[in-house]
From Swiss-Prot:
This is Acetyl-coenzyme A carboxylase carboxyl transferase subunit alpha. It comes from the Bacteria. The keyword DNA-binding does not apply. Pathway: Lipid metabolism; malonyl-CoA biosynthesis; malonyl-CoA from acetyl-CoA: step 1/1. Acetyl-CoA carboxylase is a heterohexamer composed of biotin carboxyl carrier protein (AccB), biotin carboxylase (AccC) and two subunits each of ACCase subunit alpha (AccA) and ACCase subunit beta (AccD). The keyword Lipid biosynthesis applies.
């Protein structure tokens, strides 16, 4: 499977291409040479180079990884982490927005409501999922699922991965801002545990609408910001080409969000990013979700709401 190497990974890509070429020659038996030693040498060199590059990534490089086309999406994690997933559709008012997926599932045997934004892989799916940008009906579907979880006393797990809420005219006419605001209000008052994880892009209000939780996590190479680096650059410098500078200035990385107290945990990704070792990433994420829910399950409704309120009110203060 092609790893779709990013620009800053090109030295790694060149080594991997050499390795694949040598393996291909060896498999065809065209040369009476022992290629195993050379393949091993190049593999070791590729590993060392990957470690070196990924030990010093800038904010813009992290932003590129957060958008990687092979990065696991919500439905991938649902498949790898949960069992007995039963998807629920529609907002019971207008339509079913497929940019938001959710339903009842089991996490290590415990019934939970899992909700997340879903991007697409191929062109048709990207269009069907609206490139992971939910409309009001998507957020109202998420709200309906969260209220169902409240009714049946199920913990809520959300996966955040969106460039932002859809800014189209129709979405605005149907109350995009109201839908986001209502979700924030309701999530702050739910009496069941809520664990949120940014798995890719955490874009502005579109991310916050399913991001109010008792525990908020970020994967190591995910981002969280009020606007995309390109959008910020277009406003401040009148050119999207300044996106790398904007990414650094905004502090979009998980490490920076943790320093600011905006998230509780940064979940390490396998070397090279979650897309290279999806199953391993799922194991790490599952472990964190189970630990978070375990720490919250023993709290009373009053304790849960008090902790959540204090957490929200601490934002913006030293």
């Amino acid at each position: 499977m092609s790893l779709n190497f990013l620009d800053f990974e090109q030295p790694i890509a060149e080594l991997e291409a050499q390795i694949e070429e040598l393996k291909s020659v060896g498999n065809r038996g065209q040369l009476d040479l022992n290629l195993e030693e050379e393949v091993q040498r190049l593999t070791t060199k590729s590993q060392e180079l990957t470690e070196k590059i990924f030990s010093d990534l800038g904010a813009w490089q992290v932003a590129q990884l957060a958008r990687h086309p092979l990065r696991p999406y919500t439905l991938d994690y649902i498949r790898m982490i949960f069992t007995e997933f039963d998807e629920m559709a529609g907002d019971r008012s207008f339509a079913n927005d497929e940019a938001i997926v959710g339903g009842i599932a089991r996490l290590d045997g415990t019934p939970v409501m899992v909700i997340g934004q879903q991007k697409g892989r191929e062109t048709k799916e990207k269009i069907r999922r609206n490139f992971g940008m939910p409309k009001p009906e998507g957020y109202r579907k998420a709200l309906r699922l969260m209220q169902t979880a409240e009714r049946f006393k199920m913990p809520i797990v959300t996966f955040i991965d969106t460039p932002g809420a859809y800014p189209g005219i129709g979405a605005e006419e149907r109350g995009q801002s109201e839908a986001i605001a209502r979700n924030l209000k309701v999530m702050a008052r739910l009496t069941v545990p809520i664990v949120c994880t940014v798995i890719g892009e955490g874009g502005s209000g579109g991310a916050l609408a399913i991001g109010v939780g008792d525990r908020v996590n970020m994967l190591q190479y995910s981002t969280y910001s009020v606007i995309s680096p390109e959008g910020c650059a277009s406003i401040l410098w009148k050119s999207a080409s300044k996106a790398p500078l904007a990414a650094e200035a905004m502090g979009v990385t998980a490490e920076r969000s943790k320093e600011l107290g905006l998230v509780d945990s940064v979940i390490p990704e396998p070397l090279g990013g979650a897309h290279r070792h999806q199953e391993e990433m799922a194991v790490r994420l599952k472990r964190q979700l189970i630990a978070d829910l375990g720490s919250l399950q023993g709290l009373s409704h009053e304790e849960l709401l008090d902790q959540r309120y204090r957490k929200l009110m601490s934002f913006g203060y030293c």
